[in-house]
Amino acid sequence: MIHNEEEQLEKKIEKNQDPKINHKKYDSDNLIKKNLIQFLEIQLKESEEKIIEKEEIVEKEIVLIHNRFNKEIEKSIKFSLEKIIIDFLPIIDNIERALNLIETINLKQEKYTEILKKLQFICNLLEKFFYLFNIKKINDTNVLFNPSIHQAMSIHYTNDIISNQIVTVMQSGYILHKSRLLRPAMVVVSKEKI
């Protein structure tokens, strides 16, 4: 009997409910869900695009860092000899001075000719060393003075030579790999007499 009463009560409730109201509620819930899904899909797409952009930026930065690192390594290797060569330059200068002294004095004694041969041999080895490691000697005369590779030590006033020419090289200069000045050449520069 109780069971019957419950069934009757349920039927009454169903009859009293308006199906349009129930349907509207369902439609509204569906609309909210659809809107939420669309919103979440848009956010997901935007997030994916941002992630892709950031990945591209990170990849570019990694390539830049890699290239910069490789350039630094190349530069370090290329110019690793710089300090050693700079310290070695006074020794080279002294060998050249000794060679020039013996040649200018023109000593004919056997011991001096033997020293001269050995000094010339050392100079030839140094030239090969310079060539091997791309070191250029700056010792040209009758060229225009270039302040980036020459240091003027004196001025020679004359009308025989064009002004601003290298007349004499007092001390050779050196360039490493055509770009790094190890030491400027100490030179005498010509200037017109007034």
Swiss-Prot record:
<comment type="similarity">
    <text>Belongs to the GrpE family.</text>
</comment>
<dbReference type="GO" id="GO:0005737">
    <property type="term" value="C:cytoplasm"/>
</dbReference>
<feature type="region of interest" description="Disordered">
    <location>
        <begin position="1"/>
        <end position="22"/>
    </location>
</feature>
<keyword id="KW-0963">Cytoplasm</keyword>
<keyword id="KW-0143">Chaperone</keyword>
<dbReference type="Pfam" id="PF01025">
    <property type="entry name" value="GrpE"/>
</dbReference>
<dbReference type="GO" id="GO:0051087">
    <property type="term" value="F:protein-folding chaperone binding"/>
</dbReference>
<dbReference type="GO" id="GO:0006457">
    <property type="term" value="P:protein folding"/>
</dbReference>
<keyword id="KW-0346">Stress response</keyword>
<dbReference type="InterPro" id="IPR009012">
    <property type="entry name" value="GrpE_head"/>
</dbReference>
<dbReference type="InterPro" id="IPR000740">
    <property type="entry name" value="GrpE"/>
</dbReference>
<dbReference type="InterPro" id="IPR013805">
    <property type="entry name" value="GrpE_coiled_coil"/>
</dbReference>
<protein>
    <recommendedName>
        <fullName>Protein GrpE 1</fullName>
    </recommendedName>
</protein>
<dbReference type="GO" id="GO:0000774">
    <property type="term" value="F:adenyl-nucleotide exchange factor activity"/>
</dbReference>
<comment type="function">
    <text>Participates actively in the response to hyperosmotic and heat shock by preventing the aggregation of stress-denatured proteins, in association with DnaK and GrpE. It is the nucleotide exchange factor for DnaK and may function as a thermosensor. Unfolded proteins bind initially to DnaJ; upon interaction with the DnaJ-bound protein, DnaK hydrolyzes its bound ATP, resulting in the formation of a stable complex. GrpE releases ADP from DnaK; ATP binding to DnaK triggers the release of the substrate protein, thus completing the reaction cycle.</text>
</comment>
<comment type="subunit">
    <text>Homodimer.</text>
</comment>
<dbReference type="GO" id="GO:0042803">
    <property type="term" value="F:protein homodimerization activity"/>
</dbReference>
<dbReference type="GO" id="GO:0051082">
    <property type="term" value="F:unfolded protein binding"/>
</dbReference>
